[in-house]
Amino acid sequence: IMTSPVLVTSDSYIQDAIITLFMYDADVIYVIDEDKLLLGIMSRKDLLRASLNSNIASTPVAVCMTRMPHIKICHKNMNILEAAVLLQDYAIDSLPIVDQENERQILGSVTKTALLDYIIQQARSTEVNREEE
């Protein structure tokens, strides 16, 4: 259920981040540095708030993003239930999936939508198997 994360660099402007968010129909944008390491995250809510309080064409996302280490993360070997609990407990829409040795190396992301799609697919599959028995 890991998906490709939507990325912008820390020197991108809020206006560019908003456009990127809607182009990819994403819930969040991950902010990376020049070495492609995770620096922060911006949700739709963060971008909306930033657009109300600043000049979006000239304000870098780095000014408004939630920074590491204040970001909830998961590792690729984390089970689905653990990821779901993090999403639910912290009321967030997406988690970055990071490398076990380097928690700034983003590998992908998991969203509430992808997780729910997976659960529904598994439940339907279980129903079909029961009906066939």
What would you call each of these model-derived segments?
Residues 30-31, 112:
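Conserved SAM-binding loop
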Residues 32-33, 98-101:
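Core beta-strand residues in small-molecule sensory/regulatory alpha/beta domains
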Residues 13, 21-28:
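Long hydrophobic segments that form regular secondary structure
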Residues 1-4, 18, 38, 43-93, ...:
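Tandem CBS (Bateman) regulatory domains
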Residues 6-11:
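Signal-transducing coiled-coil linker helices
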Residues 27-28, 93-95:
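Short loop/turn microsegments at loop-to-beta-strand junctions
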